[in-house]
Amino acid sequence: MEVINVSKHYGHSIILKDINFALNKGEIVGLVGRNGVGKSTLMKILVQNNQPTSGNIISSDNVGYLIEEPKLFLSKTGLENLKYLSNLYGVDYNQERFGSLIQELDLTQYINKKVKTYSLGTKQKLALLLTLVTEPDMLILDEPTNGLDIESSQIVLAVLKNLALHENVGILISSHKLEDIEEICERVLFLENGLLTFQKVGKDSHNCLFEIAFSSATDRDIFISKQEFGDIVQEEGLRITMSGNIQSSELFKFFNENSIKVIDFETKKETLKDIYLNRSK
């Protein structure tokens, strides 16, 4: 799937502006941003449920879409929902494939019960199962772990990993559960003020956060004015927090060369939550 210069306007309001990215087969990509920045609008455009004001989408015809609040036939069983959609889309019900998915999603004990008896999390897992009826090449998932406890979330994430790895499905996930995005996604797209920015995801690609306390305002100001190691993401009195892909030894060498006195120094790996919060300031 390729998104080319996609923009969306509602009257004078610009929701999306010149969005460009690709979703490759076998890749899992995260989409994050504050409420109301256009994530759901972008997803609807990707599956042709909404039209862009300008730009193009190059995509397979076989795209599965999970909305944040999926609609299910509550008076029917899970299996009846599944067979109904198979018939609606004109595809054969693949008992072997869906028997395996039902088991992987821990739905075996629920699949023959009426959906109205399901918990929110079980409904969500059934909704994900239904998006797989057509064996899509691409999946667009809006809050796929919504309503799920930690154990059920892990079950869903494992299924998504298997789909990407073994069936070469490209998956775009929007979620406020940043820990899920961090665990499963190879890339993350930040939607901010109608624009997309990119940030690699994964333990090996994260920067470090350095919390540095200086002995004086002069030392602090010299460091801020001269350093080219990374971004200052927080400044409070004599203490700053900096994000950068550098070694602590490089910083201490810089301190010594510039006669900068430091009274406290801490470092930790920057998480996706850190990145998100820093970008949202």
Predicted segments with their positions:
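Short, charged/small-residue-rich alpha-helical element at the C-terminal edge
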Residues: 210-279
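Catalytic Walker B motif of ABC-type/P-loop ATPase nucleotide-binding domains
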Residues: 139-143
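The feature captures the beta-strand-to-loop junction immediately N-terminal to the Walker
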Residues: 32-34
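ABC transporter nucleotide-binding domain
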Residues: 157-241
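Conserved ABC ATPase "signature" region
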Residues: 83, 87, 93-110
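Conserved structural motif at the start of ABC-family nucleotide-binding domains
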Residues: 1-3, 16
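Helix-to-loop junction immediately C-terminal to a conserved catalytic motif
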Residues: 47
